[in-house]
Amino acid sequence: LHLDHGTYEGCYKCIKAGFTSIMFDGSHYPIDENVAKTKELVAVAHAMGMSIEAEVGSIGGEEDGVVGMGECADPDECKRVADLGVDMLAAGIGNIHGKYPANWQGLSFETLDAIQQKTGVMPLVLHGGTGIPADMIKKAIDLGVSKINVNTECQLSFADATRKYIEAGKDLEGKGFDPRKLLAPGAEAIKATVKEKMELFGSVGKA
């Protein structure tokens, strides 16, 4: 059970609640404070047998009601956080949460390459996977990205399938209003999206 974009306080709550993995998002703190809090949480999480992901460089878009512009992380700051012993590192490389605007400049592979050179074998995480072109995804993987988060695209697939079910009047046929039936098309749509992403990411058969 993983916590995504957790606050300092939220991480402690999830540690106590028995989560198996946490992500501490300290990207909005000055780097020294981010390092200090991350170091503390690494020690606590590892003592509990949990994995921990950290973030450097704020990832733009909207996540849990917070809106921001994508920025590129400083590779040297990434190394400082990676050296703390985190299990995964999320670094801003121009990626954002949610839908990408028409004027999006794309991922900064120069930044990603520099981060990979500084952090070595550290598994890198790409947030905001929705809408990134397949060729960019594959290049990011080649440059060290090991985990890609895709949320908005799954939600859009769910909403579209559920909308079609209701617009077709299926909820008015028999017991089509049963939540298990009403929500089933959306769930299947998410499965299809996940399968598509697994094939693109090269993660099929690696569970």
Task: Give the residues covered by each predicted segment.
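Thr-Gly-centered strand-to-loop micro-motif
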Residues: 126-128
